[in-house]
Amino acid sequence: MAKSNPSLPPYPPPEPEYPFQYIAADYFTFRGKDYCVVVDRFSHWPEIFMSQQGGSKRFVSCLRSMFSTFGVSEEISTDGASVFKGGLTQSFLRDWGVKHRLSSVANAHSNCRAEIAVKQAKRLLTDNIDDSGQLDRDAFHRALLSYRNTPDQFTKVSPAKLVFGREVRDGVPMIPGKYSPHEAWKEALDAREKAVAKRQVLGHEKWTEHIYQIYQL
């Protein structure tokens, strides 16, 4: 009997070149409630949504919100759960031009970033349960902000800095200038503000001249 040819190794997901080019998503349950986590594979910036009803409708709503904030991703990696394979999700991804990469037993590593994000999300949730056993939402979101500002142990750069070019304000006192944008951006913003101010002055002068002419009639 002839030996069967060995199967080809699974094609690995491509390496991202910029924030939110490639994202990964997964669902998990914590204390009887469903959550969806979506993570950017470039910066490891996580988004964590509570899903009251679950299902594709809520997932699509989460993606729509993310795409309008961070831009439309080229590809999303998920497992084969029905919420990801459902017709509503597939139609949304197709309409927005997003490729869907499904993980499998042979290619489980393609969604490992989402699985890591789930562990981190559960840790954040666990650490912010109040004395009554309920999630302290303010404390949780502050912890999420802090996590996004925490430098990666390997790259030494935080998710926030990779996405925005600076840390985001999380309520922790910082030295002056910590949240300032890049100098080149500041110069462009200053030029824009000067141009706006100039237009306002010209507009005011024209309006004043027009009013004066009316009074002269």
Regions found by a protein language model. Name each.
Residues 67-73, 95-99:
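Secondary-structure transition/capping motifs at alpha-helix termini
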Residues 70-85, 111:
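Acidic/histidine-rich, metal-coordinating catalytic segments
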Residues 27, 41, 53, 80, ...:
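Residues immediately flanking
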Residues 48-70, 82:
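Active-site beta-loop-alpha junctions of metal-dependent nucleic acid enzymes
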Residues 30-34, 45-46, 56, 83-86, ...:
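Flexible loop/turn segments at secondary-structure boundaries
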Residues 1-35:
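Mobile-element integrase/transposase regions
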Residues 40-50:
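Electropositive, glycine- and tryptophan-enriched low-complexity nucleic-acid-binding patches
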Residues 1, 89-217:
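Domain-scale segment recognizer with a strong primary affinity
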